[in-house]
From Swiss-Prot:
GO molecular function, one term: heme oxygenase (decyclizing) activity
Superkingdom of this protein's organism: Bacteria
Transmembrane segments: none
EC number: 1.14.14.18
Enzyme class: oxidoreductase
PANTHER family: HEME OXYGENASE (STAPHYLOBILIN-PRODUCING) 1, SIGNAL TRANSDUCTION PROTEIN TRAP
Gene Ontology CC terms: cytoplasm
Functional description taken from the UniProt entry: Allows bacterial pathogens to use the host heme as an iron source. Catalyzes the oxidative degradation of the heme macrocyclic porphyrin ring to the biliverdin in the presence of a suitable electron donor such as ascorbate or NADPH--cytochrome P450 reductase, with subsequent release of free iron.
Family: Belongs to the antibiotic biosynthesis monooxygenase family. Heme-degrading monooxygenase IsdG subfamily.
The protein's name: Heme-degrading monooxygenase
Residues that bind heme: 76
Length: 107
């Protein structure tokens, strides 16, 4: 499993706008190898808002296939193009080495 973290810097007070863009079903949910998505908001006091979109994929190749797909282009063009409140972003890739799940307690 691979995690792709897209850390985005946003004008102070406008982070909620990016969060809202991801608070709906999109085309990514139908992509081969897609395992899930989380939207993370950094609560530290800063001069900018920081929102990280974390996606989980079976393989890095699955993520790259998504970025080359027509669905990706549609999601990132036209009225869905990069809003002016986004100041910049950085994408990081993480290989998942250990996963631990909760153990159900006996009743």
């Amino acid at each position: 499993m691979v995690i792709v973290a897209n850390k985005t810097l946003i004008r102070k007070g406008e982070g909620h706008k990016l969060v809202k863009r991801f608070d709906k079903i999109g085309k990514i949910e139908m992509q081969k190898g897609f395992l899930g998505l989380e939207v993370l908001v950094n609560a530290k006091e800063k001069e900018v808002d920081e929102v990280t979109i974390s996606t989980r994929w079976e393989t890095k190749a699955d993520f790259h296939a998504w970025t080359k797909s027509e669905a990706f282009r549609e999601a990132h063009s036209g009225r869905n193009a990069r809003p002016d409140y986004i100041l910049g972003n950085e994408i990081e890739f993480y290989d998942v080495e250990v996963v631990r799940m909760p153990i159900a307690q006996a009743q």
